[in-house]
């Protein structure tokens, strides 16, 4: 893979930034693609652009605002609260998001001569999102290959690891401080450690605390 090119689905968050650093080590050339689906915080797109610029990565932003029209949810509508009732999908789930993002990323990848697509979806911490499952990604990979007659390979470096191991991976990639300080995971639009209260921040902090404890234990 060292001589090949990849496109990273990139939001500027912890997971996709870790995947970006992973891709930079795996491939000769890397591009990033971010999707504007009228998410609550436009800062997400700005954050992604700033990270890509700092790392010298070509960055494309695609307009996916149609998603907001089709699938109202807590990530795009300020009048919808962020909730997760037992047995139901979280209000932050955007119907069809990863299906569309990966499909459009594949179209872009083919246009720029890349066959590798990298995404930060994770089944371990998938929070009830059906489009973060390994079975979905593998199925879509086959569908994309058939639909465009092109040998795409979708990579999911985080699929089987939890948030603590995601922090560990960023550390192994030499990107721990960068990811901690410059990424945007918070649903309330606060870069770095975030608000500490939304589900995304709580998951991120729990993973960070666990990893830091493990790292200190290993040094002892």
Swiss-Prot record:
Subunit structure: Homodimer.
EC number: 6.3.4.20
GO biological process per UniProt: queuosine biosynthetic process
Gene3D superfamilies in the record: HUPs
Record-listed ATP binding positions: 10-20
Textual note on the cofactor: Binds 1 zinc ion per subunit.
InterPro entries linked: QueC, Rossmann-like_a/b/a_fold
Catalyses which reaction(s): 7-carboxy-7-deazaguanine + NH4(+) + ATP = 7-cyano-7-deazaguanine + ADP + phosphate + H2O + H(+)
Molecular function in Gene Ontology: ATP binding; ligase activity, forming carbon-nitrogen bonds; zinc ion binding
Sites where the protein binds Zn(2+): 186, 195, 198, 201
Protein name listed in UniProt: 7-cyano-7-deazaguanine synthase
Pathway(s) served: Purine metabolism; 7-cyano-7-deazaguanine biosynthesis
Keyword Cell inner membrane set for record: no
UniProt superkingdom: Bacteria
Keywords from the named record: ATP-binding, Ligase, Metal-binding, Nucleotide-binding, Queuosine biosynthesis, Zinc
Family named by the database record: Belongs to the QueC family.
Protein's organism: Bacillus cytotoxicus (strain DSM 22905 / CIP 110041 / 391-98 / NVH 391-98)
Cofactors demanded by this protein: Zn(2+)
Protein task: Catalyzes the ATP-dependent conversion of 7-carboxy-7-deazaguanine (CDG) to 7-cyano-7-deazaguanine (preQ(0)).
């Amino acid at each position: 893979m060292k001589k090949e090119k990849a496109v990273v689905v990139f939001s500027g968050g912890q997971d996709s930034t870790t995947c970006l650093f992973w891709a930079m080590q795996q491939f000769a050339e890397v591009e990033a693609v971010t999707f504007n689906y009228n998410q609550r915080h436009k800062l997400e797109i700005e954050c992604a652009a700033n990270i890509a610029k700092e790392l010298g990565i070509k960055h494309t932003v695609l307009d996916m605002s149609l998603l907001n029209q089709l699938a109202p949810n807590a990530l795009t509508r300020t009048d919808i609260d962020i909730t997760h009732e037992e047995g139901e999908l979280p209000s932050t789930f955007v119907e069809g998001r990863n299906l569309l993002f990966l499909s459009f990323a594949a179209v872009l990848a083919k246009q720029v001569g890349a066959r590798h697509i990298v995404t930060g979806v994770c089944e371990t911490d998938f929070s009830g999102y059906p489009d973060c499952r390994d079975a979905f990604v593998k199925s879509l990979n086959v569908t994309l290959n058939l639909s465009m007659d092109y040998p795409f390979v979708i990579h999911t470096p985080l699929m089987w690891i939890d948030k603590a191991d995601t922090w560990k991976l960023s550390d192994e990639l030499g990107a721990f401080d960068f990811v901690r300080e410059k990424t945007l995971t918070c649903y309330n639009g606060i870069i770095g450690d975030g608000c500490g209260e939304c589900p995304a921040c709580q998951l991120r902090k729990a993973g960070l605390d666990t990893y830091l404890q493990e790292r200190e234990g290993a040094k002892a």
